[in-house]
């Protein structure tokens, strides 16, 4: 006797379907990983989402929770597994795994604790998705993006750190709040390290093409009577403040990562401040990853915008690079 399914559906094709073309994998289903996953789903960027973690019960629970919302989503397949075979044929892999930053802890103090974890993760990702683009989110993101590049063997344009995309978003929000406009109407960039030594590009800050530095030549300096420099200090302190208040940061970085994912998936050629290999740029001679304005497209980092920086801004950028290299040079087994 025919089943309900057989009576209801008449198949016209029974062969194998093509593998997913826009599969996204998120490694690590903690607060940040799930914020990235949900943001990608809500922006309809993936035709398959894979989740990977070592904590199997939580992993399965997160997968089921998302699957139960399938009616409200347009991603036909959501899978998970401890084994990296579940990530096969990913176009973009978002790496959020690692130990969490504690209150008052510098991102750079996290490095050695996370490097050993990456030694197990990255080779497995590349094994199953050799053509993927890697977006590293785990902190300290600049050093761990360098570590990922070394461990993966992938070309530098396909290994990207989330970098100062979020720092710049915080900067634009805080500056726009003070100016009484929407964040998208304030143009400003934070470059360098994602964290304590980030570099605000005051020389390029503008609204509708009007340079704030021309209106106030001292903007961002200690001599500035309006104390705009305080805004950058708030950017640096904001992550620590959120961690103090709620224990972690997740929503803003999730939205930021989805923004990067969209530019790559849709080949948008949008410019984002993300962490990329900067050796040979701005007089930096070491192999370090720092955030510069990068054109993101289907290749990953398609190109880097040569921003006109002041002597002081270049000096700060070099200082960022020196600090990161000082840590990287002592890393082993890369």
Swiss-Prot record:
Broad enzyme group: oxidoreductase
* Major subcellular location class: cytoplasm
Q: Where in the cell is it found?
A: Cytoplasm
Q: Which positions bind NAD(+)?
A: 30-58, 100, 139
Q: Which reaction does it catalyse?
A: (S)-lactate + NAD(+) = pyruvate + NADH + H(+)
Is Magnesium there in the keyword field?
no
Does the entry feature the keyword Lyase, yes or no?
A: no
Question: What family does the database annotate?
Answer: Belongs to the LDH/MDH superfamily. LDH family.
Subunit info? Homotetramer.
Name of the protein this chain belongs to: L-lactate dehydrogenase B-B chain
Q: Which organism was this protein described from?
A: Danio rerio
């Amino acid at each position: 006797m025919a089943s309900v399914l057989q009576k209801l559906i008449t198949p016209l094709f029974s062969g194998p379907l093509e593998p997913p073309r826009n599969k996204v994998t998120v490694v690590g289903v903690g607060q940040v990983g799930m914020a990235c996953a949900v943001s990608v789903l809500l922006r309809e960027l993936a035709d398959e989402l894979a989740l990977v973690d070592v904590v199997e019960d939580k992993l399965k629970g997160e997968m089921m929770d998302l699957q139960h919302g399938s009616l409200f989503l347009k991603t036909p397949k959501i899978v998970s597994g401890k084994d990296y075979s579940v990530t096969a044929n990913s176009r973009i892999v978002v790496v959020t795994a690692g130990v969490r930053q504690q209150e008052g802890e510098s991102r750079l103090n996290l490095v050695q604790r996370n490097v050993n974890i990456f030694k197990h993760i990255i080779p497995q990702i590349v094994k199953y998705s050799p053509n993927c683009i890697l977006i590293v989110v785990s902190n300290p993101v600049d050093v761990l993006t360098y570590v990922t590049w070394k461990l993966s063997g992938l070309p530098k344009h396909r290994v990207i750190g989330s970098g100062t995309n979020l720092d710049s978003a915080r900067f634009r929000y805080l500056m726009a709040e003070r100016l009484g406009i929407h964040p998208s109407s304030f143009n400003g960039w934070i470059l360098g390290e994602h964290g304590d030594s980030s570099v605000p590009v005051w020389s390029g800050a503008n609204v509708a093409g009007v340079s704030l530095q021309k209106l106030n030549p001292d903007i961002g300096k200690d001599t500035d009577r309006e104390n705009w420099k305080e805004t950058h200090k708030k950017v640096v302190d904001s992550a620590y403040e959120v961690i103090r208040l709620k224990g972690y940061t997740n929503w803003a970085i999730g939205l930021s990562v989805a923004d990067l994912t969209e530019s790559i998936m849709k080949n948008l050629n949008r410019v984002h401040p993300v962490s990329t290999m900067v050796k040979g740029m701005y007089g930096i001679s070491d192999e370090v990853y720092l955030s510069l304005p990068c054109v993101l497209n289907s290749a990953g980092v398609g190109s880097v915008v040569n921003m006109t920086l002041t002597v002081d801004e270049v000096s700060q950028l070099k200082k960022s690079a020196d600090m990161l290299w000082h840590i990287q040079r002592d890393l082993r087994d890369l």
